Amino acid sequence: MSEVLPLITRRGDRIAFVSGLRTPFARQATAYHGVPAIELGKLVTSELLVRTGIDPELIELLVFGQVVQMPEAPNIAREIVLGTGMSVHTDAYSVSRACATSFQAVANVAESIMAGTVEVGIAGGADSSSVLPIGVSKALARTLVDMNKARTLGQKLRLLSGLRPKDLLPVAPAVAEYSTGLRMGDTAEQMAKTYGITREEQDELAHRSHKLAAQAWESGVLRDEVMTAYVPPYEKALSEDNNVRHDSAIEQYSRLRPAFDRRHGTVTAANSTPLTDGAAAVLMMSESKAKSLGLTPLGYLRSYAFSAIGVQRDMLLGPAYASPLALARAGVALADLTLIDMHEAFAAQTLANLKLFASDEFARNQLGRNAALGEVDRAKFNVLGGSIAYGHPFAATGARMITQTLNELRRRGGGLGLTTACAAGGLGAAMVLEVTP
């Protein structure tokens, strides 16, 4: 549906974000090496509760996501509830929408508040690319199942004798789309070629992302929304994202070779977001509940939308499909926005989506609209940098973007912000946020 859809409770309350927090993000196998996503989720949720001063018993619902799931704890949300002092009666369930996972968590909490089933909830996500579910081959997995049913030692030995040495090798998690076999970087290369995105344009966007993120850290504007993380073995603390290049220089980017299409490609490690560990969460409640608790909301959820497209080509166009829906449901136009924050999975993907925002042909042929959303004012776009600089713990990125946008809107005296992301599987997400003066 594309008509205006006010997000209010049955009592007429808006959906309020009271607080948001994240851990510093760390590149794979660095500061959080060996720390599972569950522990990162507990860490950020505990600190969020402490900082807001809210009684943990008041939390009625926690919706959390994890993209790289661990088999031993498939419901990360419930483990966070049990490990952070909330009531054992607090409902909790996990969601996964690839890179848009915490957008989904926020939408689910919002829907529960609108339905009147809860008044207070936490949404977020955590991921670790350093603690991975290492699997076994299909042959070994089948043999282990059969051995469990074997009755005698002889039967078990006969089963084992059918294995080959290669069957005993560990199997790393897949980095490609299940349905196509394409890696995300392969899709980014497709998009660069389809939409004529040059290597120079990609490198410039990556440089801009790092430069603005470095300025944000140096100015101190991120301090209140990023906690200091102490993790085992508790020898060092991490207080800043360790992927941000404070000395980024544009000439450095041209030295890297293509990472996916080695001969003709333009997507490199430098103009892509790295594998990252981290967690982020937001505290949500009805507007009247916040008032009764004496809490001042950061801002409000004005609208949201999700989208899905084909996965064979250019599947990372989620922002171009979901954003028009979110804006229409909020009853606003692109020109009404104060800020636009788009997830930078790859510079090529980001630039392709920006092109389609301004394409009348795309609007008519793919969206059924009379005209394009419009050209994005770069002065409003990813003003604090983006995922290429901060990193991308898959399930945490949406909550980071929401908190960051709300805080920046407050610093600017209020306004409307669009946060939007692409996701694996041809999925997309967009949310319109509002901060009143």
From Swiss-Prot:
Catalysed conversion reaction: an acyl-CoA + acetyl-CoA = a 3-oxoacyl-CoA + CoA
GO BP: fatty acid beta-oxidation
GO MF terms held by the record: acetyl-CoA C-acyltransferase activity
Gene3D superfamilies xrefs: 3.40.47.10
Compartments where found: Cytoplasm
InterPro entries, per database record: 3-ketoacyl-CoA_Thiolase (IPR050521), Ac-CoA_C-AcTrfase_FadI (IPR012806), Thiolase (IPR002155), Thiolase-like (IPR016039), Thiolase_acyl_enz_int_AS (IPR020615), Thiolase_AS (IPR020610), Thiolase_C (IPR020617), Thiolase_CS (IPR020613)
Gene Ontology cellular component annotations, sorted alphabetically: cytosol
Residues of the active site: C99 (acyl-thioester intermediate), H392 (proton acceptor), C422 (proton acceptor)
Signal peptide: none
Cited function: Catalyzes the final step of fatty acid oxidation in which acetyl-CoA is released and the CoA ester of a fatty acid two carbons shorter is formed.
Family label: Belongs to the thiolase-like superfamily. Thiolase family.
Protein name: 3-ketoacyl-CoA thiolase
